[in-house]
Amino acid sequence: MAAYSLTIKPSAMKELQVVLDKSTLSRLIEKIQLLATQPRPSGSEQLAGRSNLYRIRQGSYRVIYSVDDQLRVVDVVKVGHRRDVYR
């Protein structure tokens, strides 16, 4: 299976920099990198009402991303604490 191209929006990159816990940050980065080879990993869920948006969890944090299968692109659009990320 060919890999997907992975892009991270600048706003999502800023949100990643806010994560203070270094172990959580490293696990978030690891999970984001894995999206390039497996865009819909076990535990990912499609967001209700959004045909192309998915989320993965890492502790209390969520990564919201879109998948374009035709262009083979995964675009990380938002990263944040679960209480804030869906707003």
Predicted regions and their residues:
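Basic, Lys/Arg-enriched alpha-helical interface segments
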Residues: 1-58, 69-75, 84-87
